[in-house]
């Protein structure tokens, strides 16, 4: 049986940092207020010259080096982003051109904060079907470009950055047990007004700003993520104690805590980077994975659980054996 095996991870963060104290000079807030409600201390934001495709390219370079893979070996690139540089061409083709991945198909997807897991599921399916062998998945976002910096309910939440994974197709006998074990993707378009931007190319001609019904989204996030995780574990004949590490979308530490409490999962098994990165949408999971691997926390053979929820609303969960 053919499996999608994780081989490398990379990340990129813009140099500019905005702390909660910096924000207190812009809107009516304090470091204590933001941290207590979200777990966020600071966020990285793009400056002139930092584009989503450039950040994606830099993260991809590190991931390819980590995997020991050359650019010409890559045959699939998917970029998950809700903040592309242009309507067209896609960020993925820009990355392909910058890296010299001349043998790779390339396209973008947009499932907002769930985008990286949607991309992971597509890559897994294509590798298993024999349509790709070495794939690059990138989540890259410039959320600061769609934030109203006068709205304290949203501007404190988001940051910019990029993260990337490399996957290889391998036979089960080559690396027994390793690879993407299972994925569950979900959506509920009736809740599209819970989190959205008030603009778009065909509607207003402008990107617009993020609008959010925070309390409603919070409640749905806790219920939907915990339910999806339970369903995935049950279908995989696993219990929560089987999980070595949980890497959730880094949206709000209170959501994460409520989810793990519902599941009975130890906080010691949760990888958090929200304090340093804030909510980087589709980039948050690979950014957290990169930091955990660099710190030596995540090891070969570990079972890692991913979970994310975002605008749409969309949500997804995935199990990966390293």
Curated annotation (Swiss-Prot):
GO biological process entries: fatty acid biosynthetic process; secondary metabolite biosynthetic process
What SUPFAM superfamilies does the annotation carry? Thiolase-like
A GO term from the CC aspect: cytoplasm
Matching InterPro entries, A to Z?
ACP_syn_III_C, ACP_syn_III_N, FabH, Thiolase-like
UniProt keywords, alphabetically: Acyltransferase, Cytoplasm, Fatty acid biosynthesis, Fatty acid metabolism, Lipid biosynthesis, Lipid metabolism, Multifunctional enzyme, Transferase
Q: Is Kinase given among the entry's keywords? A: no
Question: Chief subcellular site?
Answer: cytoplasm
Q: Which residues form the active site?
A: 113, 249, 279
Q: Which cysteines are joined by disulfide bonds?
A: none
Q: In which pathway does it act?
A: Lipid metabolism; fatty acid biosynthesis
E.C. numbers? 2.3.1.180
One matching Pfam family, short form?
ACP_syn_III
Determine the domain of life of the protein's source. Bacteria
What GO MF annotations does this protein's record show?
3-oxoacyl-[acyl-carrier-protein] synthase activity; beta-ketoacyl-acyl-carrier-protein synthase III activity
Per the record, what are the reactions this protein catalyses? malonyl-[ACP] + acetyl-CoA + H(+) = 3-oxobutanoyl-[ACP] + CO2 + CoA
- ACP-binding: annotated segments: 250-254
Q: Where in the cell is it found?
A: Cytoplasm
Role summary:
Catalyzes the condensation reaction of fatty acid synthesis by the addition to an acyl acceptor of two carbons from malonyl-ACP. Catalyzes the first condensation reaction which initiates fatty acid synthesis and may therefore play a role in governing the total rate of fatty acid production. Possesses both acetoacetyl-ACP synthase and acetyl transacylase activities. Its substrate specificity determines the biosynthesis of branched-chain and/or straight-chain of fatty acids.
Q: What is known of its domains?
A: The last Arg residue of the ACP-binding site is essential for the weak association between ACP/AcpP and FabH.
| Family recorded in the similarity comment | Belongs to the thiolase-like superfamily. FabH family.
Assembly and oligomerization: Homodimer.
What protein does this entry describe?
Beta-ketoacyl-[acyl-carrier-protein] synthase III
């Amino acid at each position: 049986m053919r499996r999608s095996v994780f081989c490398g991870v990379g990340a990129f963060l813009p140099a500019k940092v905005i702390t909660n104290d910096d924000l207190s000079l812009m809107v009516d807030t304090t470091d204590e207020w933001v941290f207590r409600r979200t777990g966020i201390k600071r966020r990285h934001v793009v400056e002139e010259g930092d584009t989503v495709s450039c950040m994606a390219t830099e993260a991809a370079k590190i991931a390819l080096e980590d995997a020991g893979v050359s650019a010409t070996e890559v045959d699939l690139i998917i970029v998950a982003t809700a903040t592309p540089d242009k309507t067209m061409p896609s960020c993925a083709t820009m990355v392909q051109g910058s890296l010299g991945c001349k043998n790779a198909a390339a396209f973008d997807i947009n499932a907002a904060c769930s985008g990286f897991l949607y991309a992971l599921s597509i890559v897994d399916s294509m590798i298993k079907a024999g349509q790709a062998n070495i794939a690059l998945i990138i989540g890259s976002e410039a959320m600061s470009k769609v934030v109203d910096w006068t709205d304290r309910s949203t501007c404190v939440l988001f940051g910019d950055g990029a993260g990337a994974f490399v996957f290889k197709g391998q036979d089960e006998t080559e690396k027994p047990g390793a690879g993407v074990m299972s994925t569950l993707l979900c959506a509920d378009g009736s809740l599209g007004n819970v989190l959205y931007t008030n603009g778009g190319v065909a509607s207003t001609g402008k990107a617009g700003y993020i609008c959010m019904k925070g309390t409603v989204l919070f409640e749905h996030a806790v219920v939907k993520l915990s339910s999806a995780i339970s369903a995935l574990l049950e279908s995989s004949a696993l219990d929560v104690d089987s999980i070595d590490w949980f890497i959730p979308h880094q949206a709000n530490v209170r959501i994460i805590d409520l989810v793990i409490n519902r599941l009975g999962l130890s906080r010691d098994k949760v990888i958090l980077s929200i304090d340093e990165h804030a909510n980087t949408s589709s980039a948050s999971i690979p950014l957290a994975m990169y930091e955990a691997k660099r710190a030596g926390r995540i090891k070969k053979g570990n079972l890692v659980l991913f979970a994310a929820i975002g605008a749409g609303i969309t949500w997804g969960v995935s199990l990966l054996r390293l």
